């Protein structure tokens, strides 16, 4: 307890609630995640019930006409437990910043990057896991990883011109045949047990996703070669990179980092909100997550890192690989003056450099400092924000996660840009499925906001102003 109290002081008041929760259950040394959840959930249910009884009618915020027409930006309308996006600090996973997660989460033997299993444990429980708990999760996912034969057959028979994200979504939907929740619901299970079945489905799906994703990659880009077998002695990311046919240890380390930092980003983004919305209809884990992946496949959500690489490649083609700052400034101004944006810069919520960009930059500085594409990205980081500030249009002139991730993947030989969003999808499962468990545990109802027509909204405004 003393150690946790000291940690609370070190990490600050914003993390204290997370640490108090951890302290309350510090004696729970079980390596079985479901057992720990069984202890946590009743207490959290009681806490939320009391909170709603006391403050259920409290006004949280106002809704403006611009919010309704502007994609509900800034509208507070969701409860999402696993992560919070602060405009000035960036993402916090259960109260922990990315640098804190990099420092505190368990790592593979000899590795330096956090294991995604540890982040999932943190997202689900609010507690920093032990190495033993993370090892248990790695082994548990290895046990659950096998794909049913009909999904394998389906993947093997997709046409090669079908987009990797379409294949991913279809395969996840087909895995719905394995849903524990769907079967139990059809048999009339009590709603207090919903979370237990959703938990099983989430664990199964996360375990199987690397196999699905690797099979898509091998079929499209490696002549349909076998993904091989899961090794129960390896962690989730290591098995994934092996199945992708990448054996470079640094690439495995990159994948651990990538899968960790792309896992969750508040509840209002398209993939997280879609999963939450579809899940509120009591659609099972597979249907909810497949819907989320269809949202992620949209160019405004999950395709941004491809757009960055296309732009960087075009830049190099037009001005050369070793470009001066002056020529680079001219190119950026030409891009802006032609009505286009600089891909990878700005964010709908953030008002600072994305910490997910920063940790990828640190990885590149350590492992590929002389790579020409990275040097260009670093040069842009030095120049673009000042130009965007000078232009005066951007609310956030700083780079986001997409400004960097594609460059790292390219360096290690993964040049198939159409596939990058699949990696994003595998990672995003950790966050949205952790939340899905809690949505059912807390009994969140069917999401059903009220819509208005333009005429109705105009009449409403007239009645207020008249």
Swiss-Prot record:
Entry's localization field: Mitochondrion matrix
Residue stretch of the organelle transit peptide: 1-27
PROSITE patterns tied to this protein: CITRATE_SYNTHASE
Chain positions with Phosphoserine modification: 226
Expression by tissue: Expressed in the head region and flagellum of epididymal sperm.
GO MF term (any one): identical protein binding
CDD domains: ScCit1-2_like (cd06105)
Record PTM text: Methylated. Trimethylation at Lys-395 by CSKMT decreases citrate synthase activity. In response to mitochondrial stress, the precursor protein is ubiquitinated by the SIFI complex in the cytoplasm before mitochondrial import, leading to its degradation. Within the SIFI complex, UBR4 initiates ubiquitin chain that are further elongated or branched by KCMF1.
GO BP: acetyl-CoA metabolic process; carbohydrate metabolic process; citrate metabolic process; heart development; oxaloacetate metabolic process; tricarboxylic acid cycle
Keywords for the protein's UniProt record, in alphabetical order: Acetylation, Methylation, Mitochondrion, Phosphoprotein, Transferase, Transit peptide, Tricarboxylic acid cycle, Ubl conjugation
Primary location: mitochondrion
Modified residues (N6,N6,N6-trimethyllysine): 395
Entry-linked InterPro entries: Citrate_synth-like_lrg_a-sub, Citrate_synth-like_sm_a-sub, Citrate_synthase, Citrate_synthase_AS, Citrate_synthase_euk, Citrate_synthase_sf
Any Gene Ontology CC annotation: mitochondrial matrix
Catalytic activity: oxaloacetate + acetyl-CoA + H2O = citrate + CoA + H(+)
Known pathway: Carbohydrate metabolism; tricarboxylic acid cycle; isocitrate from oxaloacetate: step 1/2
Top-rank EC class of the record's enzyme: transferase
Function according to Swiss-Prot or TrEMBL: Key enzyme of the Krebs tricarboxylic acid cycle which catalyzes the synthesis of citrate from acetyl coenzyme A and oxaloacetate.
Similarity-based family: Belongs to the citrate synthase family.
Matching PANTHER family: CITRATE SYNTHASE (PTHR11739), CITRATE SYNTHASE, MITOCHONDRIAL (PTHR11739:SF8)
Further facts: Citrate synthase is found in nearly all cells capable of oxidative metabolism.
Name under which the protein is recorded: Citrate synthase, mitochondrial
């Amino acid at each position: 307890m003393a150690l946790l109290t000291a940690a609370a002081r070190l990490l600050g008041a914003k993390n204290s609630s997370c640490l108090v929760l951890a302290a309350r259950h510090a004696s729970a040394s079980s390596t079985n995640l479901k057992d720990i959840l069984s202890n946590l959930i009743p207490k959290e249910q009681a806490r939320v019930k009391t909170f709603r009884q006391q403050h259920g009618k409290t006004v949280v915020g106002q809704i403006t006409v611009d919010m309704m027409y502007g994609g509900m930006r800034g509208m507070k309308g969701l409860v999402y437990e696993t992560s919070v996006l602060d405009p000035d600090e960036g993402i916090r996973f259960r109260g922990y910043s990315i640098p804190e997660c990099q420092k505190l989460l368990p790592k593979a033997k000899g590795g330096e990057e956090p294991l995604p299993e540890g982040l999932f444990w943190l997202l689900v429980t609010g507690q920093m896991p032990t190495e033993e708990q993370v090892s248990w999760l790695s082994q548990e996912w290895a046990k659950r990883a096998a794909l049913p034969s009909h999904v394998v057959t389906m993947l093997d028979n997709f046409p090669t011109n079908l987009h990797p994200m379409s294949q991913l979504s279809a395969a996840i939907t087909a895995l719905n045949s394995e849903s524990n929740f769907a079967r139990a619901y059809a048999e009339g299970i009590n709603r207090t047990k919903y979370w237990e079945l959703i938990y099983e489905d989430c664990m199964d799906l996360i375990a199987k996703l690397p196999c699905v994703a690797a099979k898509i990659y091998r079929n499209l880009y490696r002549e349909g070669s076998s993904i091989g077998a899961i090794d129960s002695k390896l962690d989730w990311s290591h098995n994934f990179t092996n199945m992708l046919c990448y054996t470079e240890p640094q690439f495995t380390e990159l994948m651990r980092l990538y899968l960790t930092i792309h896992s969750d980003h508040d509840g209002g983004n398209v993939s997280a909100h879609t999963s939450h919305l579809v899940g509120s209809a009591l659609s099972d884990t597979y249907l909810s997550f497949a819907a989320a992946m269809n949202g992620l496949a949209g160019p405004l959500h999950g395709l941004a890192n491809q757009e960055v690489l296309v732009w960087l490649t075009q830049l190099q083609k037009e001005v050369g690989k070793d470009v001066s700052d002056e020529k680079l400034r001219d190119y950026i101004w030409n891009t802006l003056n032609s009505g286009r944006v600089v891909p990878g810069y700005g964010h709908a919520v953030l008002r600072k450099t994305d910490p997910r960009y920063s940790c990828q930059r640190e990885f590149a500085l350590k492992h590929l400092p002389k790579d020409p594409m990275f040097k260009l990205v670093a040069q842009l980081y030095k120049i673009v924000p000042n130009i965007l500030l000078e232009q005066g249009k951007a609310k956030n002139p700083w780079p986001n996660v997409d400004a960097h991730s594609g460059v790292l993947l390219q360096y290690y030989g993964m040049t198939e840009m159409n596939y990058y969003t699949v990696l994003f999808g595998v990672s995003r499962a950790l966050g949205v499925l952790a939340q899905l468990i809690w949505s059912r545990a807390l009994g969140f109802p069917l999401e059903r906001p009220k819509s208005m027509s333009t005429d109705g909204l105009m009449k409403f405004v007239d009645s207020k102003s008249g």
